Amino acid sequence: MSTSLSYRDAGVGIDAGDQLVEKIKPFAKRTMRPEVLGDLGGFGALVEIGKKYQNPVLVSGTDGVGTKLKLAFDWDKHDTVGIDLVAMSVNDILVQGAEPLFFLDYFACGKLDVPRATDVIKGIAQGCEESGCALIGGETAEMPGMYPVGEYDLAGFAVGVVEKENVITGLSIGAGDVVLGLASNGAHSNGYSLIRKIIERDNPDLDAEFDNGKTLREAVIAPTRLYVKPILAALEKFTIKGMAHITGGGITENVPRVLPKNTVAQIDAESWELPKLFQWLQKAGNVETQEMYRTFNCGIGMVVIVAAEDADAVRSFLSGQGETVYRLGCIRERQGNEHQTQVA
């Protein structure tokens, strides 16, 4: 008679999954909003739309962290990639004026390492807490043979809400409007395949002091900045015509996503100083300037477009919220089929 097999024999530890759920419950609980009905662990999560909305529109977004995870594996640094995961989605839905309501995560691995997964999800909860977004659930998938030992993949899903009349579409953007840029916290979560290639080729001392007391390793792995609270506060006071979250495609490819087809964002390359991380990447990788602008955020994580008469006040307000804000340039009429972002 053959030996009796269990799920554990096949490589799946149900007890480990249960242990993880118990460990992360306190972190998730800190993120809860009054709109959330019920506790973590049900088959579905219930969220009601607040009564303050007359005609609410739900805005959804999903994203991952990309190959930045490879550095997390190599450097055994797992406590901030969860922040990256949240930021990539909530910053995206913020662009349309949405207040993030809730977030779900997907964590997949070959064998569940409970302490490591706890670090990751603790970071997710921190990102949710910092953006006022409830972590209402997720999926932990342990799939033997699907991932190398010690590796995992992440996906995040955010849903927010905005009053229909307040949805930011970019349609009102016109010549003469001002382009503001909010500083990034590093490379955020994009361009890491190139970053890893540069590190591999240049073989730098990752633990030597690099910038303002930070090592190069710390500068490279720094988490994506969350812009939710300062931008939502600004929207209470000012009209923002358009925003662009600077992610994959860099400055040149993301700004046009919010511009009317007959306009161009004319950006002055000298309006902000390229942060040291990007200076190093460009030099060590011999990366052409235009390639830098279409691969990395180059120090600008969020672009905000406002009327000229509001520019100084918005800049001052966001600075007061703790953001470093640059006046990058202006919107002008487009000539023929020229690219809609011109950096010069």
UniProtKB/Swiss-Prot annotation:
<dbReference type="GO" id="GO:0006189">
    <property type="term" value="P:'de novo' IMP biosynthetic process"/>
</dbReference>
<keyword id="KW-0436">Ligase</keyword>
<dbReference type="InterPro" id="IPR036921">
    <property type="entry name" value="PurM-like_N_sf"/>
</dbReference>
<keyword id="KW-0067">ATP-binding</keyword>
<dbReference type="InterPro" id="IPR036676">
    <property type="entry name" value="PurM-like_C_sf"/>
</dbReference>
<dbReference type="Pfam" id="PF02769">
    <property type="entry name" value="AIRS_C"/>
</dbReference>
<dbReference type="GO" id="GO:0004637">
    <property type="term" value="F:phosphoribosylamine-glycine ligase activity"/>
</dbReference>
<comment type="pathway">
    <text>Purine metabolism; IMP biosynthesis via de novo pathway; 5-amino-1-(5-phospho-D-ribosyl)imidazole from N(2)-formyl-N(1)-(5-phospho-D-ribosyl)glycinamide: step 2/2.</text>
</comment>
<dbReference type="InterPro" id="IPR004733">
    <property type="entry name" value="PurM_cligase"/>
</dbReference>
<keyword id="KW-0547">Nucleotide-binding</keyword>
<protein>
    <recommendedName>
        <fullName>Phosphoribosylformylglycinamidine cyclo-ligase</fullName>
        <ecNumber>6.3.3.1</ecNumber>
    </recommendedName>
</protein>
<dbReference type="GO" id="GO:0005524">
    <property type="term" value="F:ATP binding"/>
</dbReference>
<keyword id="KW-0658">Purine biosynthesis</keyword>
<dbReference type="InterPro" id="IPR016188">
    <property type="entry name" value="PurM-like_N"/>
</dbReference>
<dbReference type="Pfam" id="PF00586">
    <property type="entry name" value="AIRS"/>
</dbReference>
<dbReference type="GO" id="GO:0005829">
    <property type="term" value="C:cytosol"/>
</dbReference>
<comment type="similarity">
    <text>Belongs to the AIR synthase family.</text>
</comment>
<dbReference type="GO" id="GO:0004641">
    <property type="term" value="F:phosphoribosylformylglycinamidine cyclo-ligase activity"/>
</dbReference>
<dbReference type="InterPro" id="IPR010918">
    <property type="entry name" value="PurM-like_C_dom"/>
</dbReference>
<dbReference type="GO" id="GO:0046084">
    <property type="term" value="P:adenine biosynthetic process"/>
</dbReference>
<keyword id="KW-0963">Cytoplasm</keyword>
